[in-house]
């Protein structure tokens, strides 16, 4: 994500399937989908796959945080809700206490598992139902977004993220604004970019979802891609950049660095 090239949408997206876009996945010797939504129209390289559901992996952290905030499980994004107790964890950066703000930046899985347990099954299920988040299925409360029980499509992701950008999800405006603050990836005088990545090593699938906001335009996006080797995880950022650049080349968006 650190080398993420960002783009501005300034024209409406035409509904359609662009075969040229699809070549980017082929060029990387993999399969996947990219879909964008401007609030009215969609564009995708593969609408069929864009409607196919997969585990959201760490992209669900966006909505895990939203449900927690809206239900008062945490007061705000700065409250320390997770305390590291010396247990074995996957990454060194996870060996520390966490707030929502710090945990989402580190994609700190143990912290979000603890958050889900604090939310509880009943409240979490109510949250998923309110969102119409994928198949809304919960298996075990602290693994359901990782173990393939919860499934969501790229189109559904793009829809939800566009609603989040507008504060139009069925949650308080305050909670939605707080969540957007912690997924803000980059900003300048022209635009703000909000994004979250995810990777499911059970099915070797990587995600990038988010939205771009300018003074008078918003574009949400979702990309998922099959990753044969975790060493090639950067493919997802490369693909996203190529897709957005393609819109730029077609005078749909303007790029900047």
Identify the role of each PLM range.
Residues 14-50:
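Beta-lactamase-like hydrolase cores
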Residues 17-23, 28, 53, 117-122, ...:
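Structured C-terminal helix/loop/strand segments within mature extracytoplasmic catalytic/sensor domains
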